Each structure stands twice: as C-alpha cells, then as structure tokens.
C-alpha cells in the first residue's frame, strides 16, 4: 500500500474531442452514404478539422509517453526517497526547495540498480526529472496551414499567352505566309499505269520468249547453225512490231484521222469548195510527164491505203488545246477515269487540302495584321506608362511645395499641365 501511495504517476483525465462541435463537417461527411461523395469546396474545411483531430491525438500520445517514462524512472530508483518527495511536491504544485541536501542511506535491495552515494549531493539529478513533468500546462499547438501555390502556378502558365508580342514573333508569322516549295507536288496526279493483270501477263510472256530463245540458241549451237533472229533481243523485236502495227493500223472507213480531228476539219472547211470531177477538164498528158503521172496514179497505187504518221498524238493535242480554250468540256473524258475510285478519292482530298490551305492562309494574314496593330498599341501603352511617371513626379513636387507651405512656381504648374495634356493625347490615340 505504501508503494502505491508513493507512485509518481499523475493519471491524467483525457477529454475526448466533441466531433459535433469541433468537427461538424467531418461528422456530416461520415454520416453520408458512399454515393454522395465529397465536394471540392469542402476539402479546406475537412483538412483543418482533420489537423485538429491529429493535434489532439498527438498531445495525448505525448502525455502517455511521459507517464511511461516516469514509471520507468520510478522503478529504477525506487529507493531514492528524495526523488519521490520531489515528485509529490510537483504534483501538489509546491516549488522545489533549493538548498544543501541531507545525507541519506541506501534502502534499496541488492536486486535493484545502484543509487547515488550516501554523501553525494543530488541536486544535479533532480532538475531534469522536474522538467519531465512540466507538460500539463502546454498550449494546444495551432496547426500550420500549408501554403497554397496553385494560383502562382496558374498565373505562371497563363503569362506566356498574355505577354507582349515581340518582333521575332511577327517575323515568324511572315515566314509562315510564304508558300512552301513542295506545295505543287501535293496537287500532281501521277499517270495511270497498266493494270496488274496485263503487266503480269506481259512479263510472263516475255519470260517465256526469253526461255524459248535461250533454248533455241542452245539447240542451234549444238547443230552449228545460229539463226539471224537469235542475235536480236526479243524485247526490241516486240517493240518494233507493236510500233509498226500502231502506225499502219487503219480504221474501218479508211481515214487515218480521229473523230475529233474530222469534226474540226468539217467545221473549218466549207462544203462543195472543189468542183466535181465531171465538170473539170482533163488535161492531156504527153511524154515523160504523162508517164510519171501515170505511174503515180496507177490502179495499184489507188488501192494502197492512205497513211499519215502520228495521227494519235495529233488527236490528243487537238483535244487538249480545245479543252484549254474552253471549246470542249473537260467532262468528255474516257469512262475509265470516272470509274477510277482511287483517282476520285485523290481529287477529293486535293480539293479539301486546297480549301484548308486557303483558310489557313487567310487566318495567318488576319493574325499578322492583328499582331502589327498590337505592336503599335504596345508602343502607345509604353508611352502612357512614361507619361504616368512624369505626372506622378509633377504631383510629388506640388505636394512637397504645399507641405512646406509655399505656392508652387509657375514652371512647376506649366510642367504638370503639359504632362497631363500629353497623357490625354496618348490615351486618345490608344482608344482610337
């Protein structure tokens, strides 16, 4: 019983925090359902209330740690009555007595740790123990509000968009208005090649011809006879044959010209301009002239078809020229072009690209014009700031003169009026 009476523990009464009064927002959030959630405007209040609860819990934790330390020290120095007396005095609030300590004998058992010597003063060991118990009157720590750096970050991100326009930015806009060098490449339509089935068939045919010519050459070498055709390239022979067939190919009516060329000639040449053969006199031919002309107009020559070279190229050139002059519509194209889905899609995308490029160019011109106007306005605003400084200087001079109880001079008044008029004129230019 005596040991329990001498126990230095203070047995603090921990008062719980009233959540309804101290933390109303925290209590309301706990009472909600999970679907309601927490609003953004409630975060600051919740943070302050949670910090209040944290400070209360940390204060109770410090008190419990102090009680544990007191119990440990009391167990280690159970025989020291001086320490127990000072602890009881501290509980009652009595100030410790400073003076020469009395000598005491050790009363502890052998099992405990050694205490201080019998004739040794204990004032040095007493003072730290008294400081350990001074925690009841500590004020509640006010939670420190964290620094809110969000506005600074926001204005730092917005600043480049609100800054003044520089000459380098105007120069960049002027360079963007220059047309790119490869702009014409995007509107070119590549020529339509052969269909893959025709190309593959022709390649297979040429490959077979080469194999046949190679086999024939090997056979002729074995026989010792090399034909004249094996020395020629089969590919060149095919090209020459196709060219000759194309040149000598005649339509059914025997006219080498195309339909467009015939229509053009019919539109330009009048009818019945040549007299009939019956009305024209037939001159008498004699001698060599008659022989030569007769040879030229022999029945054999009349049966020979009339041939004109390059009729196909003439037809295509006439068609292109008529389309360029506006006499022929460009829709009169072969049906294969209108049925080509790739070509139609390519032209559609080229039209979209052309419209988008024109729109971007217009917007760039507008942006360049606005940038130049803003640069001139920036110069006017700079002049306004300089005029404001001059007006403030004149105002300070006049106020200093009034404080000294003297009338401002005529020079100071004239200077003030002059700066005010200059400022008004600059503001009119800026508003205009």
From Swiss-Prot:
The gene is Tada3. Residues 87-127, 272-319 are annotated as: Disordered. InterPro entries: Histone_AcTrfase_su3. The keyword Transcription applies. Residues 40-69, 367-407 form a coiled coil. The modification Phosphoserine is found at residues 280, 298. This is Transcriptional adapter 3. It comes from Rattus norvegicus (Rat). The modification N6-acetyllysine is found at residue 418.
